[in-house]
Each structure stands twice: as structure tokens, then as C-alpha cells.
Amino acid sequence: MSVEFIYPEFEVIRNESKCIACRVCERQCANEVHSYDEEHKIMKCDESKCVNCQRCVSLCPTRALKIVKSDCTLRENANWQNDTIKEIYKQANSGGVLLSSMGNPKPLPVYWDKILINASQVTNPSIDPLREPMETRVYLGKKPEKVQRNKDGTLNCELPPQLELSMPVMFSAMSYGSISYNAHKSLALAATELGILYNTGEGGLHEDFYCYGENTIVQVASGRFGVHEDYLNAGSAIEIKMGQGAKPGIGGHLPGAKIVGDVSRTRMIPEGSDAISPAPHHDIYSIEDLRQLVFSLKEATEYKKPIIVKVAAVHNIAAIASGIARSGADIIAIDGFRGGTGAAPTRIRDNVGIPIELALAAVDQRLRDEGIRNNVSLVVGGSIRSAADVVKAIALGADACYVATAALLAMGCHLCRTCQSGKCNWGIATQRPELVKRLNPEIGSERLINLMTAWKHEIKELMGGMGINSIEALRGNRLMLRGIGLNEKELEILGISYAGE
């Protein structure tokens, strides 16, 4: 029997003078951290199972609980840090690949925080969004190079299919199975109310959600789970998932424990079987192959829906995007290395890919240099945390942004990063019925609507301060940005000047 070397990461601090042994913590914890000692009439806890999801802390009626990070550490070593050593212990115990959830948590540069936004002062007037109109509406899809008119002044150009958004934000792909039915419904309800879109992810679309089709993007991934003619025609757009920011170069994996009931039927795979998406699409090994799938999907939907191609931000992303822009795709979605996931190998999540800020700037500039920027719209994701990040992304060249982790937080996620376990105490990343019901989709959607409404107000305020009254005028306007704490090469790639210049 092996010795367990790993000390619990978190400690449960219980104020015995406040605790009334109501056992709420015991009932609410899917990880079975808390238990009641009948003999001594007290609550006990197994701290080795605690993931710091804060469910017990939030629901304790007397505020008797708090979770703190353990101060029990190994001897300090700059090379062999505590996390590194504990990961080796885990692999020595299990012999398996380490799995993690959410995005890259390492203390690597966050370029959004090193970019500052301009404001109008004296020489050019700012705009008051409370008193003057501000246009946050955007259209995604292929645009003509120039506007042509008939002799009577009417437009003489036919636009390919476009996606209309009330603001430049969409809910990113999170599959049914990785998140719960109620979480998906929350996203669908919110997207419909807000006039934006949400993405089904690679798990198909539950039959109950077909009614939200006008605000839905359906995804086709390498596993082709849940893909059929009705599914393709159900949404307003189709996204081909070639890669994901949290795990570039590999496919998805949803454990069989989550393939139950409606998830099994929606994905069209046997109940209890692992849903393993191949690393590549086995019909795509070149840009020409991608072009064939793009036009196959257009044919299947009678050229009525824009086609999105989603890729992870990797080292040669500008060249990849150039090829995609020539493939017939209408929109390119790029996912940065901090993008979230329900489960990914830890080594890949923490070491593969590049920041979305650098990828976006490089792609936008490459497409402009090649004269094909209007061939596609650019949507970026991978840790878009606030309205300020959205504004900076658009100024760097994006047409719109994908958000996912921020949406999960709005629904109640506490970022404990154990989505892969299926034991989400907040009813989001789980398929256990007793946990799923903890998320009320009416409340979840209301909180999402509140978040996006707040962001929309903030986007208008930031634009107004710059003297800009439309997203179109902001897109690619890098003169509105300045860098701080960046070196010359970083500034060159981002295409911005240093603060003070």
C-alpha cells in the first residue's frame, strides 16, 4: 500500500461557537467533505476531498465556515515548486495523465492588463452615451470590398448571410454534457433576450432548445456528435471546430459518467460510453479539405447560414487564418491559451498555445496586408473578462468576442477548476440530477442578462470617452490603444505605441 504524500490543499475552518450542526454543509457537498458525528453531536470534515467551491460557505446559515489555503508547504525551492512536486506524487500514485479544468492559471503575462485606452480631451470632443446615440450593433460575415450603387442610388451588392448582434459579444461553445441542461437553457434564454448568440459546443442540440435557433450557433467537431440535417438547419450559423485554446492539437473527451439520458440521445452515442473526439477531423488534412467541408455545409443549408471556423491560437496562427479566409468560411473564431475547458490534460493546458491578444493582432494585420480582411469577420475568445477587454479586442481588430468563463461565473461558478469530476456543486458542470436542479435557468439567464447589459453600458461609456460612436469606427483602430510594461517586440506585434508616444 502506497504512502499518501499529498497534504490537503485546503483547510476547512469551522467556528464551533457559530455552528448549529444543521448539516446544510453535509447535504450541499457532492464531494462528501462534511459529515455528522452522531456520537459527539458535532460536524466533522475530510479536508482531502475539498476543492474550495465555496458552496458550504455560501449556504451556511450562521456563517460558521470558511475555506483557506493550507499553509503546510514543502521546503522552499525555486525550481521544484510545491505544485510541481504534488503533481509528481499524483502521477506516481495513479500512473495517469493529469487532468484539469478551466483556462491556464499560470502567472504568464495578461496583455489586456498592459494595454491602455485613449480618451478625448480638449482637441476632440467626447460623446455622452446617456444623451447621444451609440451603435453597439455588429454584423458578422463576409463583406464586399466596396459599395456599388445603381443609377437611382440604391445598393447594387448582394451580401452573403450575416449574423446580427445587438452588442459585440457571444456566448462561446460549451457542450451539453460538459455543462448541464439548466446551464444550456440559461445561455439560450439569455442570448434570445439580449439579441446575441450562444454556441452549442460539440455535443449536439437538445430537442427542447430548437426553438431558440435564431440565437444559436451549432458546432461541428471532429467527433461529429449529434450532427444531422435538422441540427445543421436549427441554428443561425455553423461552426467547424478545428481547435480549442485550452487544448490545441488534441480532441475533446467527455467521460462516460456524463453520457447519461438525454446527453446520450442528443450526442447519438451509447449511454455510459466515453465521447472521444479525434485530434484531427479525419476528412480534413489541408486547406483544400477544409474548403470542401465548408461548402458541403453551405450546400446542406442552401447557402443560408454563415460558416465559422474555430481554431486555437498557435505559433503560426496568421498563416492559418490566411488559409481559412480563402477557404470560403465567413467567420474565423480564434481561441487563446487562457480559454476555458471542461477537461484538458494539464500539461497541454499550461504549455501549449499563445495569448489571444498577440494572435488577434497578428491575424488582423496579416489579413489586411494580403487585402482579404473583408473576406471574413474575426471573433476572439480565451479569457475575455470585462467590457474593457472587449473594447481592447475590437480596437486590435476583432469584430466580436466570445465569452464562456465569465458567463459561468455569472451563473454561480466559483472557479474551483474541477469540472472534469462531474461533481459541480453549483449545478453547472454536472449531469447528476440532484445537482443540476440547483441551477434555476430563469435565475441563471437573468444574471447573464444583467452581466451583458452592464457590459453594454460600459462599452458605450468607453467608446464615448474616445469620441467614437460605433463599433465599426472602433474596429482595428489601434491608435486608441497604448502599451505599458511591454518591450519593443510586443508593441510591434500588437501594432500599438508605448504610453506617452
What are these regions (language model features)?
Residues 13-14, 46, 170-175, 379:
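Short glycine-rich or small-residue beta-strand-to-loop segments that form or flank ligand, phosphate
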Residues 3-9, 75-119, 341-357, 365-377, ...:
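Conserved active-site-proximal phosphate/metal-binding subdomains
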Residues 238-287, 292, 299:
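Active-site cores of enzymes that catalyze phosphoryl transfer or operate on phosphate-rich substrates
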Residues 8-10, 21, 26-27, 31, ...:
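Glycine-rich phosphate/ribose-binding loops and adjacent secondary-structure elements
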Residues 1-6, 33, 57, 61-262, ...:
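Conserved, well-structured core domains of diverse proteins
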Residues 37-51, 72:
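Short linker/helix segments within small regulatory modules
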Residues 199-204, 303-310, 373, 466-475:
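Flexible, glycine/charged-enriched surface loops at secondary-structure junctions
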